[in-house]
C-alpha cells in the first residue's frame, strides 16, 4: 500500500510539474490565406506570421473595432462542435478587446458585437478574422502520450486589419497554437481558452512593438 501511495503521489506530482511547464504554445501556421496582395510570411515572435502593407503606420489610428471571428474549420459538423465554435469565437473577441484596451494604444476599442461602429470615426481600424483550425484533441491521449504531442488541442487565428475609411487591408496575421500537456491531460476547453488568451495577449505585445517602429522579428 505504501508503495502504491508513493507511486500515486509521484504520478500526480509529475503531472502537476508537466502542467506547469507545458501550456499552450505557438507553432508555424498552416497555409495562412493571402488577401489584397498581402501574404503573412514574415515570422514574428509574438504574432506568428505577419504581412504589413507598405507605409502602414499604426500610430495614426486612434480607434480600433473588433469583429467576431467565423470558425471555418471543416471538422465542425455537429451541434456540439458548433456550440464550442461559437463560445470560443466570443471568448477570443472579448480577450482581444480586453488586451487592446489594456495596451492603451488606442483612444477607443470597440466590441462590434456589443456596440455599432461609431459613425465617421477618424483614423479607425477594424479587425476581421477567421478561425480555420479548431480541435479539442483527446484528453485521454494527452494524459498518456501528451509529452510526445498526442491528443493535442489546436487552433489557428487569422486576422485582417482593415482601414475603415477605405476598406483597404493594411495588415494580416496568422497565429497557430497547440497544447498537449496538463494535469491528467488537461481539459480541452481550458487548453483552447488558454490558446486564445495567449494569442490576444501576444497580438497586443506585437502592436506595441510595431507602434514603436520595430519591425516584425522571430
Tell me the role of every PLM-derived stretch.
Residues 96-105, 136, 179, 204, ...:
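Sec-exported extracytoplasmic/periplasmic mature domains
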Residues 149-156, 162-209:
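Short secondary-structure boundary motifs at beta->alpha junctions and helix caps
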Residues 102-116, 214-215:
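Surface-exposed patches in mature extracellular/periplasmic domains of secreted proteins
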Residues 89, 93, 97, 103, ...:
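Extracytoplasmic/secreted envelope proteins and their assembly/folding machinery
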Residues 24-33, 109-166, 181-186:
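Surface-exposed short loop/turn segments
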Residues 1-11:
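Bacterial N-terminal signal peptides that target proteins for export
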Residues 18-20:
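C-terminal motif of bacterial Sec signal peptides marking the signal peptidase cleavage site
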Residues 22-95, 175, 205-218:
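A structural "domain/chain start" motif
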Amino acid at each position: 500500500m505504501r508503495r502504491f501511495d508513493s507511486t500515486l503521489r509521484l504520478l500526480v506530482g509529475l503531472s502537476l510539474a508537466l502542467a506547469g511547464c507545458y501550456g499552450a504554445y505557438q507553432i508555424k501556421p498552416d497555409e495562412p490565406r493571402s488577401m489584397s496582395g498581402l501574404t503573412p510570411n514574415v515570422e514574428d515572435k509574438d504574432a506568428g506570421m505577419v504581412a504589413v502593407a507598405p507605409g502602414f503606420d499604426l500610430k495614426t489610428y486612434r480607434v480600433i473595432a473588433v469583429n467576431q471571428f467565423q470558425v471555418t474549420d471543416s471538422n465542425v459538423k455537429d451541434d456540439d462542435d458548433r456550440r464550442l465554435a461559437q463560445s470560443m469565437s466570443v471568448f477570443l473577441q472579448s480577450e482581444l478587446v480586453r488586451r487592446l484596451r489594456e495596451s492603451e494604444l488606442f483612444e477607443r476599442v470597440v466590441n462590434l458585437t456589443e456596440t455599432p461602429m461609431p459613425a465617421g470615426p477618424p483614423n479607425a481600424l477594424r479587425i476581421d478574422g477567421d478561425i480555420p483550425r479548431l480541435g479539442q484533441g483527446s484528453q485521454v491521449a494527452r494524459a498518456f502520450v501528451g509529452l510526445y504531442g498526442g491528443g493535442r488541442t489546436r487552433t489557428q487565428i487569422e486576422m485582417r486589419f482593415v482601414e475603415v475609411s477605405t476598406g483597404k487591408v493594411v495588415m494580416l496575421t496568422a497565429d497557430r497554437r497547440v497544447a498537449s500537456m496538463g494535469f491528467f491531460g488537461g481539459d480541452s476547453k481550458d487548453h483552447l481558452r488558454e490558446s486564445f488568451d495567449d494569442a490576444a495577449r501576444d497580438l497586443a505585445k506585437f502592436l506595441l512593438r510595431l507602434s514603436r517602429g520595430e519591425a516584425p522579428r522571430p
